[in-house]
Amino acid sequence: MDSTQPLLGKTILNTRGKSAAAAFSKKILAAGGTPIEIPLLTFQKPKDTTIIAETIKNLHRYEWLVFTSKNGVDFFFEFYDQVLEKVTKNIPMPKIAVVGSKTEKTLLAKGYRPVLVPDEFIAEGLFESLRPYVMPGVRFLLARGNLSRSFLVDELTKHGAVATDLIVYETVGDSRDKEHLITLLKEKQIDIITFTSPSTVKQFYKIVEQTEWEEWTNHVLFACIGPETKKAADHLHIPIHICPKNYTTDHLLDEIINYLKA
């Protein structure tokens, strides 16, 4: 293996959404690999955004604003800026907590610094970090996607806090490259398939479930980010070979390289 290009000769399926795919592909190329981008998900605003605008106008009622993804930050602040243009008063920002380094980086780019970023990049880790602040009557606003897990809302509510789930974006399966994906798998042109969320796993399976995908991928390494993504794959009998302890694409790529070296 070339130490400067450890992924040389490997074709890696990048299933990230279109806006996030380029950065991951760039890292694959830098390591000598060949990325193929087939986005399995797309993200869009909810059809009815009235409740989002009203909630943002009343942001002062919340002690905490919680983001669990980069998309949550991007969509929330798009709405926030739109509301600011229409109101004369300033809208104070609550204390902010986030999950994940990418979410934190996106928030910092908007000009805001989170009070809490847990070491563990999952909802359970965030709840443990928030626990000292969770008291009866304390109000938390969670700006998230429609497919987000209910864990945080459930735990906050269970401990007496008032948790409001604000859906600022919707995750939709993307099947536009379905035939291309099936052809690549059938012709065994893919060496490694990556998943970055449970939703990407489910959409992949939805596309291939009526095919002979198991035979077509018997040589493929499946790699994913996070225990929830692995759980979704296990449920659908997709064999995960690589799942890093840190839930970022950088660590995912490092683990793929380490696996190939072994």
Predicted regions and their residues:
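Signature of uroporphyrinogen-III synthase
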Residues: 1-262
